[in-house]
A protein has these predicted regions:
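Nucleotidyltransferase catalytic core that binds NTPs
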Residues: 1-263
Length: 263
């Protein structure tokens, strides 16, 4: 029901806690320091957990951020729940259940673009810090001007509307398959005319790199894990948390099929 409310545009977002209770973001996140990570999580992998745990450590280092006032949220957008224009309700519920089983709150929203989500959360947070954890390749997308063609002021308008609030982006590195090196905030490749903007944001404490991470996990990609599951390979189990692996096998999620035991 809650998902349908978002789907029909009656509400812009809804949340589920670890007990699968439906929450109203305006109440659950009121005056909270909010740490948000966005993605498909199909399925949630070890690298996702490393990202959120080390992103949280960086978030907790900020001034005036206290443990009791922090809400960690995994967000799924409606676009990430569609296939051929149709909402995959069961697929969403499966992903929400997996994240909830790990102890995280799940949000589903209509906000595809990051600045729109920050605009939505800012009045709820009431001056508290909003942290957004992004993989470095997603940060590349934020710095693509074509992403903001619908705004009269383009990229600068979006950045003003998003970063003008009390918010910060925490950037998680990636493995560069082309050269085998770690790709991070220090060697990110963006358009030359936007390098100054990136430096401005770094100088004004709007972007921070996540320095603690497990480099052995950076090769894990959700799409690759999903392909392994569907292909019947067993190596995917090494890429997900143990509880997630057990749930995928028990409930036969994401195309997993139990192997028949021959007698």
């Amino acid at each position: 029901i809650a998902l349908n409310l978002v789907k029909r545009g009656i509400t812009d977002s809804t949340m589920f806690d670890l007990s699968k209770n439906v929450l109203q973001p305006t109440t659950a996140l009121y005056k909270k320091n909010i740490l948000l990570t966005r993605g498909r999580f199909r399925p949630v992998t070890k690298v996702h957990i490393d990202m959120i745990e080390n992103g949280r450590k960086a978030f907790m280092e900020e001034n005036d951020v206290k443990e009791e006032d922090v809400s960690v949220v995994f967000e799924l957008t409606l676009k990430d729940l569609t296939a051929d224009g149709k909402i995959l309700v069961q697929d969403f519920l499966d992903r929400a259940d997996l994240l909830s089983s790990l102890g995280y709150t799940v949000m589903v929203s209509n906000y595809l673009k990051h600045y729109k989500m920050v605009e939505y959360l800012a009045p709820i947070a009431r001056g508290k810090l909003i942290g957004v954890i992004l993989g470095v390749y997603n940060l590349n997308t934020i710095f693509e001007e074509k992403y903001y063609g619908n705004l009269p002021g383009g990229l600068l308008e979006a950045f003003g509307r998003g970063f003008g609030h009390h918010m910060k982006i925490y950037v998680y590195p990636a493995f560069n398959v082309e050269d085998g090196e770690i790709y991070d905030l220090n060697n990110i490749e963006i358009a030359p005319n936007l390098v100054g903007l990136l430096n401005y944001m770094r100088d004004n404490d709007k972007i921070k790199e996540i320095k603690e991470f497990n480099p052995k996990l950076l090769h894990i990609m959700s799409d690759d894990v999903l392909s392994k599951i569907k292909a019947g390979a067993s190596s995917w189990e090494e890429d997900v948390p143990e509880s997630v692996g057990k749930a995928i096998k028990f409930y036969e999620l994401f195309g997993y099929q139990k192997k028949e035991i021959k007698v």
